[in-house]
Amino acid sequence: AGFAGDDAPRAVFPSIVGRPRHTGVMVGMGQKDAYDGDEAQSKRGILTLKYPIEHGIVSNWDDMEKIWHHTFYNELRVAPEEHPVLLTEAPLNPKANREKMTQIMFETFNVPAMYVAIQAVLSLYASGRTTGIVLDSGDGVSHTVPIYEGYALPHAILRLDLAGRDLTDNLMKILTERGYMFTTTAEREIVRDMKEKLAYVALDYEQEIETARSSSSIEKNYELPDGQVITIGAERFGCPEVLFQPSMIGMEAAGIHETTYNSIMKCDVDIRKDLYGNIVLSGGSTMFPGIADRMSKEITALAPSSMKIKVVAPPERKYSVWIGGSILASLSTFQQ
């Protein structure tokens, strides 16, 4: 969250609401019945964490309202009734969802004006393009969204319910098989951090497994909050490999490369060349080192041999949806 015209968000915190697992015994400790975002994160040891957004779509409106309240009053410290608001939504977000979002903004927060933009379109704006295909992969959902001259092509948008949270869960499972205990919502956050710091995408998965077997060159250490040190090797690239091979976690779905290709193939034959040449990665789950090269390699193998493939991975892509929103909302034509 932040202000239009800024080049980076003022506030970045997880969309979680935490509630105490136990009732407080110490009177006057000022315990709250709910914590949001970073505060929920830091007190996670005593809380049960809930995620009001599932697969990119709001599923718990009471908790979502708490998060918005926290955003306006504690993070941005603004009066919502004084500022027009730009919200973003997942592609193919149900209409009822958008209506509920609008209702809460106008009725609960009394905002003067609001607009809801599709996330992937904003990422494309942020990359300085109006035509291309965006692979947007966050925590709960991934989408491939072809965009032509600024318009998303809804018939060709594909959704993949596979994203960051699944990769974290997969890493938890691998570590549990190795004898480490990671089960609670709080411990999931530790594993998420491990994933973000150490995981990478192999250019050639089979070959990387050979390398991991024969040498310790890819091993890295990670220190847990209690001082215990874990060494991870093949898990580093095994964790995000799921994006390309969902069958690894028992999912019957095409990987992100194939989904991108399928999405392009649903578009008019005349615009495919423009899409192949402008494949833009967006979202936190595209931050793995090596992902752009691998994506390029996989799509080159699927596409016609004469086709020029270009995969763009902007360094700020973790926040490119927000940055695109900042650009859009600061245009005078948009404000009218």
From Swiss-Prot:
Name any Gene Ontology BP term.
cell division
The main location class comes to cytoplasm
**Where in the cell does this protein reside?**
Cytoplasm, Cytoskeleton
User: According to the UniProt record, what class of enzyme is this?
Assistant: hydrolase
EC number(s) recorded for this UniProt protein: 3.6.4.-
Q: Name one GO molecular function term.
A: hydrolase activity
User: What cellular-component terms does GO give this entry?
Assistant: actin cytoskeleton; cytosol
Q: Which PROSITE patterns match?
A: ACTINS_ACT_LIKE
Tell me the InterPro entries matching this sequence.
Answer: Actin, Actin/actin-like_CS, ATPase_NBD
Q: Which Gene3D superfamilies does the protein's record reference? A: 3.30.420.40, Actin, Chain A, domain 4
Instruction: Give UniProt keywords alphabetically.
Output: ATP-binding, Cytoplasm, Cytoskeleton, Hydrolase, Nucleotide-binding
Keyword Oxidoreductase among record annotations: no
The catalysed reaction is:
ATP + H2O = ADP + phosphate + H(+)
**What SUPFAM superfamilies does UniProt report for this protein, alphabetically?**
Actin-like ATPase domain
**Which function does this protein serve?**
Actins are highly conserved proteins that are involved in various types of cell motility and are ubiquitously expressed in all eukaryotic cells. Essential component of cell cytoskeleton; plays an important role in cytoplasmic streaming, cell shape determination, cell division, organelle movement and extension growth.
Which family is this sequence assigned to?
Belongs to the actin family.
Q: What else is known?
A: There are at least 5 different actin genes in tomato.
- Name of the protein this chain belongs to: Actin-51
Biological source species: Solanum lycopersicum
- Lineage start: Eukaryota, Viridiplantae, Streptophyta, Embryophyta, Tracheophyta
